[in-house]
UniProtKB/Swiss-Prot annotation:
HAMAP family: ATP_synth_epsil_bac. Produces ATP from ADP in the presence of a proton gradient across the membrane. InterPro entries: ATP_synth_F1_dsu/esu, ATP_synth_F1_dsu/esu_N, ATPsynth_dsu/esu_N. F-type ATPases have 2 components, CF(1) - the catalytic core - and CF(0) - the membrane proton channel. CF(1) has five subunits: alpha(3), beta(3), gamma(1), delta(1), epsilon(1). CF(0) has three main subunits: a, b and c. Coiled coil: none annotated. Its main location: membrane. PANTHER family: ATP SYNTHASE DELTA/EPSILON CHAIN (PTHR13822), ATP SYNTHASE EPSILON CHAIN, CHLOROPLASTIC (PTHR13822:SF10). It comes from Sulfurimonas denitrificans (strain ATCC 33889 / DSM 1251) (Thiomicrospira denitrificans (strain ATCC 33889 / DSM 1251)). Keywords: ATP synthesis, Cell inner membrane, Cell membrane, CF(1), Hydrogen ion transport, Ion transport, Membrane, Transport. The gene is atpC. This is ATP synthase epsilon chain.
Amino acid sequence: MSKLKLEILTPNGVIYNGEALSVTLPGEEGEFGVLAEHSSLITLLEAGVIDIEKEDKSVESVLINWGVVEVDEKKVIVLVEGAVAIRGDSESAVAKALNDAKELIESIKDNNPAIATVTARLESAAQNLL
């Protein structure tokens, strides 16, 4: 399966920069998936979870508050205001990421009625790491 280049950027820096087999994004009209050779598009993203399928078939999740994505045949560039990668090498690192993600959710809670879904996906992603 072909790979694509993925960058997730915030005003504070890079959250993810690497290759992926697929990316699932929380679009304004609903979730959508992107594979290599995808048609070009630019669209808004709402609060949700970006799932990144890596070459080893593992999935990394990144919680975002909102942003925009540009897709072309070889790369995906995601620009977001706030994001937290749900990852860590230890239980304490995962717990810190989970706490940071919950703080991000609190900051957007009033703006998004689908926040319960985001919270459930966040908890699921954290459990997969433990």
